Amino acid sequence: MVRLITYPSIDADNYLQKKTLDDANVSVQVAQVLETIRCRGVEAVFEYTKRFDGATVNEANFRVSEAEIDEAYSKVDPEVLAALRRARDNIRRYHEKQLRPSWIEPEADGTMLGQLIRPLERVGTYVPGGLASYPSSVLMNAVPAKVAGVPQVVMATPPGKDGSINPYTLVAAREAGVDEIYRMGGAQAVAAMAYGAGLKAVDKITGPGNIYVTLAKKQVYGTVDIDMLAGPSEILVIADETAPPAYVAADFLSQVEHDVRAAAVLVTPSEILARAVEGEIQRQMDYLPRREIMEQALKDNSAVIVVKDLDEACEVANRYAPEHLEVLTKEPFALLGKLTQAGAIFLGPYSPEPVGDYYAGPNHVLPTGGTARFYSPLNVDTFMKKTSVIAYSKARFEQAADDILALAKCEGLDAHANAVAVRIEK
């Protein structure tokens, strides 16, 4: 079911070569949706919602009312609500540690240089929906935005066919401090938030979605900022002979239940463990739902890679640059410094990926598809902008003038040079 690959090899090289996220046909469809909404506004959003979600949305029910959110509280399990609040508090505490103050540094001659670090004014967050419930995605996007100080956080989530929003999604939104909630999903939601169709336009859009949402975010980038381009979920597990096969198998399956495009990778120097994990995967799938999805994802996208030693395992992990990286070895912290490319690293047998996905505090909006090489997890800085401050004194200006003139003339920008020259006292 799961391919077995020896590293290094051509098979390993081929497997570790990441696939592109782009889909030409979907890109064209998304572009049409964006252009239609840009030109026609919110009425086009309503039409697409009817076509794609089967829900009737209009001016009267587009924005979720406070009364509907109040009612949602009566529909949720009190134990789940308590767990959501504890998770929210963990997420808030973790992200508060990321806050940095603005700074301005005066110098002896009166010059001042600095940086203002301030929150964005208005952020839109996308939460997958319909009949499904993803309250954890609400918390992971909205709580850091509020920690950053964003005054207006807008949420878009697709309605069910009856127009309803899952009550857990609504409750999580209020608990996280979301200010406005709209019934819309897909590329049309991204377009509405970016172009201001039926609501005030946002400055940035965050949150996961399907390929239509992801490519819509890609196409509106520049009109608004985005967090990242998220692809299918993935996990890579580095394990040695001390790892319990049942743990590795369970963590594999926790990822591939997401989607037939999800991927799970085991990298191990132990062929005995590799065989044991294969057996455990089969055993655990017998009592889990979504078997067809898991089998397809394991067959199409997943692998067991056998390496010489743990140093080689780290090399493979860094090439793959996974969204989630688990280390189930005798000395997991010994590998931490060698693992340089990952969205999140989970160390030890009691740090399975769901601990981070739901509860511990670090963000679960993570780079996928190898983009952990240059993207970071969603964080407080995601919702901040930085402005440079320059206040030169007369003495510093006169001291630097000749250097600035030389550089401006070198680049052939005479008006730049003139802006300095007119200030030099003769």
Swiss-Prot record:
A Pfam family recorded for this sequence: Histidinol_dh
Pathway membership, UniProt: Amino-acid biosynthesis; L-histidine biosynthesis; L-histidine from 5-phospho-alpha-D-ribose 1-diphosphate: step 9/9
UniProt keyword annotation of Zinc present: yes
Superkingdom of this protein's organism: Bacteria
UniProt GO cellular component terms: cytosol
Family annotation (PROSITE patterns): HISOL_DEHYDROGENASE (PS00611)
Known catalytic reactions: L-histidinol + 2 NAD(+) + H2O = L-histidine + 2 NADH + 3 H(+)
Similarity comment text for this entry: Belongs to the histidinol dehydrogenase family.
Physiological role: Catalyzes the sequential NAD-dependent oxidations of L-histidinol to L-histidinaldehyde and then to L-histidine.
Protein name: Histidinol dehydrogenase
